[in-house]
A protein has these predicted regions:
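Structural/interface elements that position substrates and couple domains in central-metabolism enzymes
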Residues: 1-120
């Protein structure tokens, strides 16, 4: 089955790299649409909390977070090894501005290097 059909039929496995203000709500939106999601974040404290169903973004209501984890629809990792099992990878990492108001792309570059180790 090609990727388009997997997405249409909700069979695509999604990886979200970065589970902060953008990544976690995006992962949750995919989960609510019945996709299987792997969330990757290098912050071990955050991944431990999320694995226990603890919402790390208090301003958001993620009422089904524990359910998605219990049903194994949402797997949380702090390394990139599981990336080889997904169909779609979405980067949601920071791009903070430096003193010259230029984006720091190091998070994107480092994530891409890690992802490249596990591409099919």
């Amino acid at each position: 089955m090609n990727l388009e059909k997997k997405i249409i039929n909700i069979k695509a496995k999604i990886a979200i790299v970065g589970l902060g203000y953008v990544g976690l709500p995006l992962a949750y939106a995919f989960l609510e649409k019945k996709f299987q999601v792997i969330g990757i974040d290098l912050d071990k404290d955050k991944t431990i909390k999320l694995s226990k169903g603890i919402n790390t973004l208090k301003h958001l209501k993620l009422k089904n977070l524990k359910k998605h984890i219990k049903e194994k629809k949402f797997k949380i990792e702090n390394d990139f090894k599981k990336i080889k099992d997904v169909d779609v990878i979405i980067l949601c990492v920071p791009t903070p501005l430096n003193k010259f108001r230029e984006p720091d792309l190091s998070y994107i570059i480092n994530s891409a290097k890690e992802i490249s180790k596990f591409l099919k």
